[in-house]
UniProtKB/Swiss-Prot annotation:
Cellular compartments per GO CC: nucleus
Protein's recorded name: Nuclear hormone receptor family member nhr-218
Lineage summary: Eukaryota, Metazoa, Ecdysozoa, Nematoda, Chromadorea
CDD domains recorded: NR_DBD_HNF4A
Gene name in the database record: nhr-218
UniProt organism field: Caenorhabditis elegans
DNA-binding region (UniProt annotation): 17-93
Length: 391
């Protein structure tokens, strides 16, 4: 059922791209009753939620709104949203999740969806500008790094995991209840680059085309990051993760995620706060009461964590690869399973390990099932940070 649902979301990627009815970049689904890209959907939501009042930058009220323009006039963009039929009541009905489908195979402008920019070129957090081309260049550099691979693919992935976590503190960590907007930007970009670095430790991933690499990264980094963060958090904080919603975000910082979002939502009125909390609470339940608790009970080894991380990646990759790459990917994934078997037999001296594997796959399936919902946490954080920056 999950695979069938995912295939349904994936189908638009295999057909001719449909342009956004507002800006003409590639759309990502129906948002507020109109086929739009993620950026235009986010812009429309912010405009309504904040009651924004715009002025035409040319004072003619007829500015061009399409992919030929680098910076859109906000008034004319909003007017075009209304003219195309975007409905304000859709915010009340379903609190549009910004994107209901997975993005397709990218050209460079679409790749900016990795950082969810408002104008597909750059985005602003509290006055800080970060262009997607800078991030894209960094990711491409990471993908270009040559790795030495061993006869054990799972050990290679573990080495990648050790590399990205090598500077993480294990003691004397501050637990914050609010996040500086610049830090939030840095955290997010750091997780994207960490995921990219880890992926390069897969010999199979490195054999794919750049387009396939970028598509896989773009579609998996957010859920991959949550499993990575929760596994490290449970290792450091134990039961505090489940009971107090404490999550490790970077090398030195952990946060009380509930208090952080309460702080982020503070400028909203009570009604809008309740709406956002109503949507976020089930997602926090999945991450902390389900996934984190299962991790706490399982206490996975480092190799087991890396096996689960790959399963999340393969869940996406097997839907988008051609027949030859799919066959090679299946062989690679089978080799990981063989390495895991050897880990149980030779390292842990377990003769019966089926129950551990079932528990691991239960964690993976929980994250797979709620893949798009988990992405909403990132969308909400970004949207409200952009909202404050505009103010």
């Amino acid at each position: 059922m999950v695979a069938s649902s995912f295939q349904h979301h994936l189908e638009p990627m295999l057909t001719q791209p449909i342009p956004c009815q507002i800006c003409t970049y590639q759309s990502h689904g129906v948002n507020f009753n109109v086929m739009t890209c993620r950026a235009c959907a986010a812009f429309f939501r912010r405009s309504l939620v904040c009651g924004m009042r715009y002025h035409c930058k040319t004072r003619k009220n007829d500015c061009r709104i399409d992919s030929t323009e680098r910076h859109f006039c906000r008034l004319c963009r909003f007017q075009k949203c209304l003219q195309m039929g975007m409905k304000a009541e859709k915010i009340q009905q379903n609190r549009d999740p910004i994107s209901s489908t997975f993005p397709g195979t990218s050209t460079e402008p679409e790749l900016s969806e990795i950082v969810d920019p408002e104008n597909e070129k750059s985005y602003i957090f509290h006055g800080t500008l970060y262009g997607f081309k800078s991030l894209l260049a960094e990711v491409r550099y990471i993908f270009s790094i040559s790795r030495n691979y061993s006869d054990s693919p799972l050990t290679d992935l573990e080495n990648g995991f050790k590399l990205i976590t090598r500077h993480q503190k294990r003691r004397y960590i501050d637990i914050e209840d609010r996040i500086n907007f610049q830090n939030l930007t840095d955290f997010r970009l750091g997780h994207i680059k960490n995921c990219a670095t880890w992926l390069t430790h897969s010999s199979f991933f490195q054999s794919l085309t750049e387009t396939e690499n970028l598509l896989i990264l773009k579609s998996t980094w957010h859920v991959w990051s949550w499993l990575e963060l929760l596994s490290v958090s449970v290792e450091i904080f134990g039961n505090q993760v489940c009971e107090e919603k404490i999550v490790f975000l970077s090398e030195k910082i952990a946060v009380d995620i509930v208090k952080v979002f309460r702080y982020i939502l503070k400028p909203l009125n009570k009604q809008e706060k309740r709406k956002v909390e109503k949507e976020l609470n089930p997602i926090f339940h999945i991450l902390f009461d389900d996934v984190a608790r299962k991790l706490q009970n399982l206490k996975p080894s480092s190799l087991e964590i890396n096996y689960m991380l790959w399963q999340l990646v393969w869940f996406v990759a097997e839907k988008v690869l051609n027949e030859d790459n799919l066959r090679h990917g299946e062989q690679y994934t089978n080799q990981l399973a063989s390495d895991l078997h050897n880990h149980y037999k030779n390292d842990l001296h377990l003769e019966q390990y089926a129950q551990r594997v079932l528990k691991m796959m239960a964690i993976v399936k929980s994250l797979q099932k709620h893949l798009m919902n988990i992405h909403k946490i990132i969308d909400y954080a970004d949207n409200f940070c952009n909202l404050f920056a505009m103010k």
